[in-house]
């Protein structure tokens, strides 16, 4: 059973370009009006935590759902560290490369639709991930760019992160990357 996707959206960008709005409009996600309205016990994608999403998270996502906060990358660290309260299972996505026109080729700065597709793919919902990405002309390019990484992540192998970061200490490398991304977006 495909996980239900819940999104709390902060109006920090152009709504005409917002991928979360399109996910909701086409029935792939449900918009909630506050962080408290996100389901307790759901997996929440949080770029500030150390624990990556893995295929073993599938069971939780199927029963409790997948939650996201749609916000500007410039404010992502503040939003995720200050506002997430409650009983969520916090996971970050493993390192991937953006295919969206705004951040094309940049590591980790994924749009909401890319994040949802990546999570679905990693948890074994590959067809559903492709279906979501087809909402945009550039969407399937996300899979093309990241195919070898997504396949390894979907098999539970997180070693591509070291390869993409070029460091052995993934936690430290991601911390440095987040600092650069949130200051220079």
Swiss-Prot record:
It is an enzyme of class 2 (transferase). Pfam families: Ribo_biogen_C (PF04034). GO terms for biological process: enzyme-directed rRNA pseudouridine synthesis. It is found in: Cytoplasm. One of its GO terms (molecular function) is 18S rRNA aminocarboxypropyltransferase activity. GO terms for cellular component: cytoplasm. The keyword Lipid metabolism does not apply. Its EC number is 2.5.1.157. It comes from the Archaea. Keywords: Cytoplasm, Ribosome biogenesis, rRNA processing, S-adenosyl-L-methionine, Transferase. The keyword Acyltransferase does not apply. S-adenosyl-L-methionine binds at residues 19, 69, 93, 108, 112. Aminocarboxypropyltransferase that catalyzes the aminocarboxypropyl transfer on pseudouridine corresponding to position 914 in M.jannaschii 16S rRNA. It constitutes the last step in biosynthesis of the hypermodified N1-methyl-N3-(3-amino-3-carboxypropyl) pseudouridine (m1acp3-Psi). Belongs to the TDD superfamily. TSR3 family. NCBIfam families: PRK02287.1. This is 16S rRNA aminocarboxypropyltransferase. It comes from Vulcanisaeta distributa (strain DSM 14429 / JCM 11212 / NBRC 100878 / IC-017).
């Amino acid at each position: 059973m495909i996980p239900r996707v819940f999104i709390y959206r902060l109006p920090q960008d152009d709504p005409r370009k917002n991928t979360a709005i399109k996910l909701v409009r086409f029935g792939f996600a449900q918009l909630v009006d506050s962080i408290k309205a996100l389901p307790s016990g759901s997996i929440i994608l949080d770029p500030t935590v150390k624990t990556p999403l893995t295929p073993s998270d599938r069971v939780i996502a199927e029963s409790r759902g997948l939650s996201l906060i749609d916000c500007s990358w410039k404010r992502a660290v503040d939003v995720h560290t200050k506002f997430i309260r409650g009983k969520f299972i916090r996971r970050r996505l493993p390192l991937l490369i953006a295919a969206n026109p705004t951040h094309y080729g940049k590591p980790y700065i994924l749009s909401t639709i890319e994040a949802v597709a990546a999570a679905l793919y990693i948890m074994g919902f590959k067809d559903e991930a492709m279906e979501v990405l087809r909402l945009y002309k550039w969407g399937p390019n996300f899979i093309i760019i990241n195919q070898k990484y997504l396949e390894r992540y979907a098999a539970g192998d997180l070693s591509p992160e070291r390869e993409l970061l070029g460091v052995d200490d993934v936690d430290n490398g991601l911390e440095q990357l987040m600092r650069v991304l949130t200051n220079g977006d």
